[in-house]
């Protein structure tokens, strides 16, 4: 059965203002551009997708958070995310290196990583998939298309996708 974006709302179960099927999803957004981060957050929230969202601005902080090191060592205050939205062009440690490290670590390799970037360079796409990205999405220029992308991303990764425990 094929659903349009408008039909997704008829299928999804809403709890409060959050889109959920099963347990709420913890999302980590790794984005250094504050305007892009604001758009992602707005897009997710306006589509009732942002269950629990942590925003970090550089690759080193993202690695510390996901690997629970340093100031993020306590899993009760820094739980591992269920989904990572990862930009490629990041300060301190670039997104491809973050992806490579996470997907080569036994404790984090099953966390879905969606590359969400402005780069449509074939080399970046190929390298991301070489490092086992679960999806590669190019940020649209149009605000309307960006909001549609966030809704589709949320519907798939938050509501429909089933991850390994």
Where are these regions (language model features)?
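Non-catalytic signal-transmission and effector/linker regions of two-component phosphorelay proteins
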Residues: 1-28, 34-54, 60-63, 67, ...
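Hydrophobic residue at a beta-alpha junction
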Residues: 90-93, 102
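The feature encodes the CheY-like receiver
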Residues: 91, 109, 121
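Active-site residues of response regulator receiver
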Residues: 87, 117
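Conserved phosphotransfer cores of two-component systems
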Residues: 75-79, 103-110, 131
């Amino acid at each position: 059965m094929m659903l349009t974006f408008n039909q997704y709302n008829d299928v999804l179960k809403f709890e409060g203002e959050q889109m959920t099927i099963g347990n709420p999803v913890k999302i980590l957004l790794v984005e250094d551009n504050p305007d892009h981060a604001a758009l992602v957050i707005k897009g997710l929230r306006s589509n009732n997708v942002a269950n629990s969202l942590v925003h970090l601005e550089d690759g080193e902080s993202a690695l510390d958070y996901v690997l629970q090191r340093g100031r993020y060592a306590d899993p009760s205050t820094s739980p591992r995310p269920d989904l990572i939205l990862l930009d490629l062009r990041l300060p301190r440690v670039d997104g491809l290196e973050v992806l490579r490290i996470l997907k080569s670590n036994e404790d984090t390799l099953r966390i879905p990583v969606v590359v969400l970037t402005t780069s449509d360079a074939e080399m970046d796409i190929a390298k991301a998939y070489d490092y086992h990205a679960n999806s590669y999405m190019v940020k649209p220029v149009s605000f309307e298309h960006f909001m549609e992308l966030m809704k589709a991303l949320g519907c798939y990764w938050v509501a429909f996708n089933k991850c390994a425990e």
